[in-house]
Amino acid sequence: MTHDKKNAKIIPFPHLKDRLVEKGMSSLKEKKYQEALELFSEAMKYDDTESDLHLGMAICFLELGELEEAESVCEKMLKEGYGHYFTVLQVYMTILIQLKKYEEVKSTIEAVLEENQLPAESAEQFYKLLDFSRKMTDPDREDEAWAEEYEDTIDTEKVLASPEEQMNLIHSLKDRNVAKYTGLLKTILQDPSAHPIIKTMIVMLLAEHEYSKPVHISKFGESLTIEPSEIVPPDAAPILHRVLRVLDETLGNENPTLYAAVEELWRRHLYVLYPFQPKLLSADLWAAALHKVGYEMHGIEIESEELHMMYEFTDRELDEACTMLKDIEEISYL
């Protein structure tokens, strides 16, 4: 009898793995990274082939500062083809940069470029990472000397003409006095051709430095005057959390994985708009639009009537909101 018990096969509760994944995604959404990691690890015992599990673990490791573990998970995903390749690759590049493995960043992106695999929406971001990694692996480069040289030899015309140079300028000013460059930064903010994300980064930079003078911004054909030190950061915008609360009651309960994806979409949308706010301010409307666009992105159809059962909106405004989400998403990466 003892022998039989010892060798009996343990049968898990039905759908236990799915419940563990859902709880893990919920904890990840709430930024409870250690709790999420433990749930994902437990789910792995039942099925170690699900891409969401691997990516969720990689993100948890990254947020917990366990970079080598995060690196290992991403390498396995890329090698075995788990998940969306370029989503995983972007996370992997982020990890390598934090590990200061610039040579690996350079060689990896160069290999991808040789195969002409980069999707158009990701190309610019990867080219910037490649250029950055090449600079960081330059044998003649010395960190402090390079930073000082950049500051002393800045070419205003070159900066105004190049998003890459604008990014370099912003990063170089993170821990420096911005006073010398506020004129240039303000010029970029009013330049119709400057990328909206660059403008967001400049406003946030000025806010971090508690810059309190009026700043004029042009974005998406609109103009706005703000005092950077007084504005609310995009991740604290009331519309962000009002929409997510509504969406959590519907999509969050129905499909936590998809909820996490559209939450990130909504955060990116507001980040690109910042410091502007959406013209339409109905939380129900934006929750419905995110629900619909999220389904479409994953190849799922949902009828307007079904959305009307969960949210209050007009069809005309829903179409407008969905178009806005898609248009902003197309330019939401540098």
UniProtKB/Swiss-Prot annotation:
Gene name tied to this protein: ysoA
TPR repeats, residue ranges: 17-50, 52-84, 195-230
Gene source species: Bacillus subtilis (strain 168)
InterPro entries xref list: TPR-like_helical_dom_sf, TPR_rpt
Protein name (record): TPR repeat-containing protein YsoA
Superkingdom per UniProt: Bacteria
Keywords: Repeat, TPR repeat
Pfam families listed in its UniProt record: TPR_19
